A protein has these predicted regions:
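Glycine-rich flavin
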Residues: 18, 25-117
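Intrinsic disorder at enzyme termini
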Residues: 1-13
Length: 117
């Protein structure tokens, strides 16, 4: 089995790595003020969304990037390497949204997915 990234995956990895290097905030996990942590994480998720890195595997018509699972894995790996904080809505992005995408009606998708991003 070949576990090497192909050229497009390497290109995406390099894009993400450069963007995170230029934009990632410091990890705030030691911040005592939880309100500040929540504020920071919301701002971070907004910045990630505006750059196209939230909802990577979600369909474009619901605000996602339309990427594949490998794109998401590459992004997750680069977030770990860069030691960035998680976005505020990790559960909604990773669990809630995908359930709505898979099983929701068109009306539910339009109503519930965009606010999760």
């Amino acid at each position: 089995m070949d576990f090497e990234l192909d050229d497009s995956e390497k290109s995406f990895r390099d894009e993400v790595r450069a963007w995170l290097k230029a934009n990632a905030p410091k990890d705030d996990s030691t911040e005592a003020n939880q309100e500040k942590v929540i504020e920071n994480r919301r701002a971070w998720q907004k910045k990630l969304y505006e750059a196209g890195y939230v909802g990577i595997t979600w369909p474009k018509e619901y605000g996602g990037r339309g990427g594949d699972f490998m794109d998401q894995l590459i992004f997750n790996d680069e977030m770990i390497v860069a030691q960035t904080p998680e976005p505020i809505n990790v559960i909604g992005l990773g669990m809630g949204g995908p359930v709505v995408i898979a099983h929701g009606t068109e009306e539910q998708k339009k109503r519930y997915l965009p606010p999760l991003l």
